[in-house]
């Protein structure tokens, strides 16, 4: 986050990623100071060239968008942001743009921002918007990846239902391992994994500190069983911990994930 007083610069982030032994980096849109506007070509190419120099692939990018709201102007704004950042992905060489089917207007939930619309109606809004974006992305060789984030999409079945309704080959799943709000999130991951075009591997599948850590062997098995051959991006979050060590946590997770892949 460029606005955070302790944030790394993008250049520092790239250098940490390479030094820690990652193969790729997800250059999320809000890592750029210009966000929500697209960065200039000069900024994009400077970051792209730095990643290349460090031996890093760019596995994807992502934006925040609103698709569950009854406010049509906000939904239109979100669609345009997605399209703008699809163009950024083309220039970065990133194959996937991550988008949300969940509200980003905290503390509200989709039931509130939708004005009380039914789940079926809201799913229709989302599907129509993402289908349009997927068509735009397909013409540019980019995938739209829909990430579950614990609001409209809380289960694997809901994730799959939405993608079936979108019904476009360039709109696929991003499996967020920490945001299926069920008793056994691994079951939900397995449901969505055949549609996956990318992942977000979290520290714990339960989204809270002091919960069992993610079983990397299970993650790798689910991905392999689904025929997935892409990247497994790691995401670590503070979750309110005062002693949180971002670099240390990322290194721990990477070591465990690489060991699971090597088995």
Predicted segments with their positions:
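N-terminal pre-domain/capping segments
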Residues: 1-94, 117-121, 131, 138, ...
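Histidine-acidic metal/acid-base catalytic patches
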Residues: 1-21, 139, 153-263
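Hydrophobic faces of well-ordered beta-strands that scaffold small-molecule active sites
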Residues: 25-27, 58-63, 97-99, 144-146, ...
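Active-site-proximal loop/turn and secondary-structure-junction residues that shape catalytic pockets
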Residues: 29-31, 65-67, 101-105, 150-152, ...
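Active-site groove signature of glycoside hydrolases
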Residues: 89-115, 140-149
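Active-site cleft segment of glycoside hydrolase catalytic domains centered on the general acid/base Glu
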Residues: 107-130, 136
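N-terminal/domain-start segments enriched in small and hydrophobic, helix-friendly residues
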Residues: 127-153
């Amino acid at each position: 986050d460029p606005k955070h007083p302790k944030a790394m610069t993008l250049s520092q982030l790239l250098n940490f990623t390479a030094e820690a032994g990652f193969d790729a980096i997800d250059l999320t849109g809000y890592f750029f100071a210009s966000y929500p506007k697209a960065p200039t070509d000069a900024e994009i190419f400077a970051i792209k060239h730095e990643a290349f120099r460090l031996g890093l692939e760019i596995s994807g990018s992502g934006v925040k968008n609103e698709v569950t709201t009854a406010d049509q102007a906000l939904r239109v704004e979100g669609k345009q942001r997605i399209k703008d950042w699809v163009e950024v992905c083309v220039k970065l060489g990133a194959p996937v743009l991550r988008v949300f089917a969940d509200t980003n207007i905290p503390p509200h939930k989709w039931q509130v921002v939708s004005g009380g619309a039914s789940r079926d109606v809201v799913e229709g809004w989302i599907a129509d918007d993402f289908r349009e974006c997927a068509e735009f992305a397909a013409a540019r060789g980019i995938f739209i990846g829909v990430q579950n984030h614990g609001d409209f999409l809380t289960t694997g079945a809901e994730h799959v239902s939405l993608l079936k309704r979108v019904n476009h080959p360039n709109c696929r799943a991003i499996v967020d391992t920490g945001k299926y709000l069920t008793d056994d999130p691994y079951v939900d991951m397995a449901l969505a994994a055949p549609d996956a075009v990318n992942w977000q591997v979290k520290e714990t599948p339960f989204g809270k500190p002091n919960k069992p850590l993610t079983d990397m062997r299970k993650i790798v098995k689910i991905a392999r069983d689904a025929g997935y051959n892409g990247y497994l991006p790691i995401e670590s979050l503070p979750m309110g911990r005062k002693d949180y060590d971002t670099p240390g946590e990322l290194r721990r997770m990477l070591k465990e994930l690489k060991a699971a892949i090597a088995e």
